[in-house]
Amino acid sequence: MNIYDVLIWMALGMIALLIQYGIWRYLKGKGKDPIPLQICGFLANFFFIFALAWGYSSFSEREYQAIGMGFIFFGGTALIPAIITYRLANHPAKKIRESSDSISA
């Protein structure tokens, strides 16, 4: 392992931190930041970074088919919690039916 490999792994860690901070800010800005949404966003971030790390390590070992497999399995797995987090964060609140002041006949 040379210095470039170490720098790549450090960069992946920094990207993971920045993405997680972005997810936190996005949910905080929407006013919807409960723990389940944070965990779901973390899982999406984890699987995305894991897919990138898998791809890099497979590329450095010259296992080119493993790159595709990692992107399909782990990248596809990252889409599921990402979509759930996005849909729940943008889900409108239920409207409460207002009572009418006028009397209808």
From Swiss-Prot:
Location relative to the cell: Cell membrane
GO CC terms, sorted: plasma membrane
Main location: membrane
Residue intervals passing through the bilayer: 3-23, 35-55, 66-86
Membrane topology value: Multi-pass membrane protein
Keywords: Cell membrane, Membrane, Transmembrane, Transmembrane helix
Function: May act as a membrane anchor for the tetrachloroethene reductive dehalogenase PceA.
Protein family membership: Belongs to the PceB family.
Full protein name: Probable tetrachloroethene reductive dehalogenase membrane anchor protein
Organism for this UniProt entry: Desulfitobacterium hafniense
High-level lineage: Bacteria, Bacillati, Bacillota, Clostridia, Eubacteriales
Gene name linked to the record: pceB
